[in-house]
Amino acid sequence: MIPARLHRDYKGLVLLGILLGTLWETGCTQIRYSVPEELEKGSRVGDISRDLGLEPRELAERGVRIIPRGRTQLFALNPRSGSLVTAGRIDREELCMGAIKCQLNLDILMEDKVKIYGVEVEVRDINDNAPYFRESELEIKISENAATEMRFPLPHAWDPDIGKNSLQSYELSPNTHFSLIVQNGADGSKYPELVLKRALDREEKAAHHLVLTASDGGDPVRTGTARIRVMVLDANDNAPAFAQPEYRASVPENLALGTQLLVVNATDPDEGVNAEVRYSFRYVDDKAAQVFKLDCNSGTISTIGELDHEESGFYQMEVQAMDNAGYSARAKVLITVLDVNDNAPEVVLTSLASSVPENSPRGTLIALLNVNDQDSEENGQVICFIQGNLPFKLEKSYGNYYSLVTDIVLDREQVPSYNITVTATDRGTPPLSTETHISLNVADTNDNPPVFPQASYSAYIPENNPRGVSLVSVTAHDPDCEENAQITYSLAENTIQGASLSSYVSINSDTGVLYALSSFDYEQFRDLQVKVMARDNGHPPLSSNVSLSLFVLDQNDNAPEILYPALPTDGSTGVELAPRSAEPGYLVTKVVAVDRDSGQNAWLSYRLLKASEPGLFSVGLHTGEVRTARALLDRDALKQSLVVAVQDHGQPPLSATVTLTVAVADSIPQVLADLGSLESPANSETSDLTLYLVVAVAAVSCVFLAFVILLLALRLRRWHKSRLLQASGGGLTGAPASHFVGVDGVQAFLQTYSHEVSLTTDSRKSHLIFPQPNYADMLVSQESFEKSEPLLLSGDSVFSKDSHGLIEQAPPNTDWRFSQAQRPGTSGSQNGDDTGTWPNNQFDTEMLQAMILASASEAADGSSTLGGGAGTMGLSARYGPQFTLQHVPDYRQNVYIPGSNATLTNAAGKRDGKAPAGGNGNKKKSGKKEKK
C-alpha cells in the first residue's frame, strides 16, 4: 500500500509541475507597464529588453519589433537602451473617454523565434482638464408665485478626468433667495439644482444674477463657472410631467439616417400658453449629440448620424420638458445599438517570406497572419482556411495569429510558384469573409542533373568532309532554372588510332554542336565512338553523359587499283602466252583489281576497251578473266595488244586501264624465233613515238662513232708500239666473243645493258639500239676456242653468226678512264675495276652483244652451250662460282624482244608450274604467269 501511495503522490507532483510550467510560460509572454498621460515623445515606459531576457543590442539582431495596429503608433522601441518609449503625446481622455481604467495593448514580435509577446500599458490619469459647462450663460425663468423649496435644475459641468481629478463639487455665489443642492446619480454623476429659499417678488426684483462654480479634486484644484440669470415671471402654478421617467430603445446599427427611434411625451395641467411644453436635451454627451436629434415640439428622437456598434454600443441621455412659466420635468432616454454583421474579418500579414527553397522541410514558416473582426459575439468569431488543394496549412498561434507553414516538401520543377488564397470567414448571418492573396516563389536548388532526350545518338557524315563542318547537335535539358540550368557540353577524353579525340572533333560548350576538326577518310576508319558530357553550373554541379556514334559514309574517291598484271617499273610490258591450239574460252590471264572503297563504290566490272584483233578475246564482266573468244588462226598476229578497263559503280564512276600483250605461240623459243618477222599493227601515234626514239638514238650513235674514229686516228701514231700486243693476240682468230668477257666485265655490262639498251616495241623491223658503249675489262679464255656460239635472232637482226671481221684487240688505253657515274650499272652506281680498259672496235661490241643474247637463250632453255654450269651465263667452270645469275638482275626484265611488248619469260615456267631443271628461279603456282 505504501509504494502505491507514494507512486500516486509522485504522479500528482509531476502533473502539478507541468501545470505550473504552462501557467508560467503563459504569464511570461504578457508584460505590463504603467505610465502617466501627457508624457513627452521618447519618454521611457519600461525596460522591454530586460523583460524579454535580452541585451539591448539583441533587439535588432533577433528582429524584435512592435506589430503595428491602426494608423497611429503610440509606442516605439529604443534599440540603444532597450526601452519601450512613447512615440507621441498620449491623451488618456482621447483614448479612453469615460473609462475608469485606460489600458493599451500592443504585440511585440521576436522574428527569429517567431514568438509574440503581449504588452499592456496602463495610462494613469493626471489633472490636466478643468471642469467646464457647455453653456457659459444660462437663463432661468421662475414665476413669482413659485413656492419656496422649489428646485430648478442647473446645467451639468463636464470634467474628462477620472477619480479625484474629475468633478467633485458645485458652489453657488451668495444671495438671499436661492441655495444650491447637488443630486448624485446612479452612475456617480452630480447634478446641481437651484432651490428657492425665499419667495420672489417680480415687482421687487425682476432678475437675479448668480454664478455657479464647478470644482474637481486635483492638485491643484481646477474650476469652471457658468453665469445664471433668473427671470421672475408671472404666476404659473403647474409644471409639466413625463409619462414615464425612463425611455428605452434597442436599434440595429445599420439604420438609415433620419430614422425615428422613440418619442418622449410630457403634459402640463395648465391651459393655454402655460400648457405649452418644449423638449430639449438636458444631458447628452458629444458623441450622442452628433448621432441623435430631439424634436423640440413633438419630442421625437431620430438619427442624424450613423450608428456603429463597434464605436459605441450604448447611449444614455436626459431630456426635459418645460412650459412657458419655466416649470420643467426630466426623463432618461437609454438607447442600445444592436450589432449586425457589417464588418468583414481583417487579415494582416505581420511577417511574410517572398520565397522558400524547394528542399525546405515540412513545417517551414511562410507567413504570420493576424485575423480580427470588429463585430461582436458570433459576428466576430472568425475561422481561417486555405482555398484549393495546396501543400500548405494554417496553424493557430498566439491570440488571433495564424502561422502559414508548408505541409509537404516542395518541388520547384513541378510547381515553380504558388498563389495562396487565405480566406477568413465570420459566423454572422449572412457570414462575411475576406480573402488575402499571397504569392510565393519556390527557390530553385540544384537537384536535377541535365537529361538527354535520347539514350544515344547517331550521326552520319560523308568522307572527305571540309574541316569545321557541323556534324550533329546534342541538346540536354535541365529542369532547374538560372545557373542550375546553364549547361556546358564537353567531350570525354579518348584516343583513336594513337591520336587524341580532340584532334578529330570538337564540341561547342554552349550549344552542343559537334564539329569536325579534320577531314575523315572512310578507308582509315569507319566510325567514331564519342561520349558527350553535359554539366550544369549549380553548386555542386551535376552532370550526365550520352554516347554518340559517328559513322563515316564512303564516297567514291578511290579509283580501282590493278594488282595483276602489275605495271613494271622499267617501262616494259608483260607478255601473256596463248597457244595457237587454244580452244574458245581458253583462259589466257586474269586481270585482278581492287577498290579501297566499299559497297557500290567497290563493285568492279571489267570490259575490253581496245584490242588489236577485235573478236579474238573477251573479258569477264565481273571476273576479269581474259579468255579466247574463238579459236586462234594462223593468220592471227603473233602479238596481240589488249586494253582492259576496270570501272567501279560509284557516282561518278572511276576507272583504271591496263594494257596486256598476248603472244600467240606455244613456247617462249617460238616467240623469240618469230620476233624477227613480227609485224605490229599500224598505230600512227606509236609509230610517231618510235620514229622519234630512232632519230634520237641514231643521233647519239653518230656522235659516239665520231668520237671513236677520232680516238682511232690519235692512236695511229702508236701503231708500231702496239705491234707486239697485236701479234700476241693473233692466236684468237675465230674464237667466239663470249670467251673474251671477264666475270666482272660481264656483270658490269649486263647491269649497264639492263638500263641503257632498249628495244622499240612497235618498230617495223626488229632493231637493237645501243647507247654509247661502256665496256669492262676483257679476259682471254683459251679453253673456249673450240666451241661455237649459236645466235638466237635471225632475219633483219643486227646480230650475225659470221661476225668475225675484226678479231684483233687493240691495246688497252690506260689514259681513258670513266668516272664513277659513267661506269656500268644503274645510274652509275655499280662498283667496277678502276684499272680495266674498254673494247674500242666494232668486233668486240658485237661479240659482247652476242654473248648476252646467248646467255639469255641459255637461261631460257635451261641448258648451257658455253660449257658453264647452271646459272653461270655460259662461262667456264673457272668463272662459274664467281658470277652466277644470283648476282645479276633477272635478264627477263632487262632484255627486250624487238618489235614487241614482251619480255623474256623462263622457258621452264610453263603452265604446269614446274621449275626449270638446274635453275635458280622462283617457283610459281600452276596456271599463273610470271610477270617481271
From Swiss-Prot:
Molecular function via GO: calcium ion binding
Cross-referenced Gene3D superfamilies: Cadherins
Record's compositionally biased regions (Polar residues): 816-841
Region (Disordered) residue spans: 803-841, 902-932
SS bond partners: none
Gene Ontology biological process terms from the UniProt entry: cell adhesion; homophilic cell adhesion via plasma membrane adhesion molecules; nervous system development
Entry's localization field: Cell membrane
Chain segments annotated as coiled-coil in the UniProt record: none
Alphabetically ordered keywords of this record: Calcium, Cell adhesion, Cell membrane, Glycoprotein, Membrane, Repeat, Signal, Transmembrane, Transmembrane helix
Signal peptide (residue range): 1-29
Residue ranges with Basic residues bias: 922-932
Topology with respect to the bilayer: Single-pass type I membrane protein
Extracellular side: 30-692
Side of membrane Cytoplasmic, spans: 714-932
Organism: Homo sapiens
Domain Cadherin: 30-133, 134-242, 243-347, 348-452, 453-562, 570-683
Lineage top rank: taxon: Eukaryota
Protein name in UniProt: Protocadherin gamma-A12
PROSITE patterns linked to this entry: CADHERIN_1, CADHERIN_2
Major subcellular site: membrane
Job description of the protein: Potential calcium-dependent cell-adhesion protein. May be involved in the establishment and maintenance of specific neuronal connections in the brain.
Residues annotated as glycosylated: 265, 419, 545
InterPro entries xrefs: Cadherin-like_dom, Cadherin-like_sf, Cadherin_C, Cadherin_CBD, Cadherin_CS, Cadherin_N, Protocadherin/Cadherin-CA
Key word Calcium present: yes
Residue spans crossing the bilayer: 693-713
A GO CC term attached to the entry: cell-cell junction
